[in-house]
Amino acid sequence: MLALFMTLAIAVQAGATENWQQKFIRFSGVAGETLAIGDVVCIAGADGQVYKADADSSTRRPAVGVIGKGGAAESTVEIVVSGILDGQSALSPGTRLFVSTGAGAFANATTGYDQIIGWVLPGTTDTATSTKYFIMALPPIPSTGATW
């Protein structure tokens, strides 16, 4: 039971573009820092550039998607709003993915800033975990206690 209440920052595994199986909705932006495939990102209001999202920072949220093609600061990067990303940390299918308090990472539990960024998809037959994530950047859950 204790595990249900713990927040886990899921390390993003740097990978090649083949980790993206499908990219349904995507757009490009200018990186404000070095960004890698799988980083959860936001667009900063101060300069309009793309940065790693962070649930603890009011200037680094809300998340708008996940990096599909990364790059160094000042380069053009691809942000995926909806798609299927494989090769990530193994979690139970159906687990909701939230913006983490660790910059650019996923969390598998709410972090105080409750924005769902995706779900863990079913893996191969007869496996209890999956490394395949369905990414769908949703607006943050209102602080009034409303839920999706």
Could you describe each region identified by the protein language model?
Residues 11-148:
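Glycine-anchored, exposed beta-strand/edge motif detector
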Residues 1-9:
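Bacterial N-terminal signal peptides
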